[in-house]
Amino acid sequence: MTKQRQKIALVCTKGGHFTEMTNLSDFYSCYDHFWITNKNEQTESQLREDKAYYINMAHFKQPWTYLSQIVPVLKAFFVEKPTHIISTGSGRTALIPYLFARLTNIRFMHIDTFSRVQGYSKFGNFLLKMGNQIYTQWKDSANSKAIYIGPI
């Protein structure tokens, strides 16, 4: 039996969520990885050396905007074949990768944003309602479904 190599999809929106993800570089740089994020000056300049798939940012109040993400996310999954997905949010970029992960039995790990001091983000709440565990950066937010990992 051959052992499957580990490949990580790093999924996040531009800005603070992207910065939080780059803070994990000591971890993910040890693995084959690629990005699914939004295109802007920050992401383009910092991902010159990495494989990146850029998708449009959707909005919960306009659910049809998620449709534009389906093809690029499918392409990324088909080409890259991730074994794990790590997301720092937000759901505006991570929802479609999460749904595909559920359909294909890919492990999805969400680290809720540090800026959410009380409670969880909308996407974090959605994941909890779907029966998923999330990782929180605040000790006060920890419980059986939200595991405290400390600030990243």
Predicted regions located by residue number:
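N-terminal subdomain of nucleotide-sugar transferases
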Residues: 1-38, 42
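Residues at the starts of beta-strands that form the adenosine-phosphate
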Residues: 7, 32-35, 51, 107, ...
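Short hydrophobic segments within beta-strands
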Residues: 10-13, 36, 88, 111, ...
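Conserved nucleotide-sugar phosphate-binding/catalytic loop shared by glycosyltransferases and other
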Residues: 12, 32-66, 140-144, 149
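Short, well-ordered alpha-helical microsegments
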Residues: 17-20, 43, 93-96, 119-120
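An amphipathic, basic-hydrophobic alpha-helix
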Residues: 61-84, 103
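An aromatic- and histidine-rich active-site surface loop
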Residues: 84-104
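Active-site-proximal region of nucleotide-activated glycan assembly enzymes
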Residues: 106-152
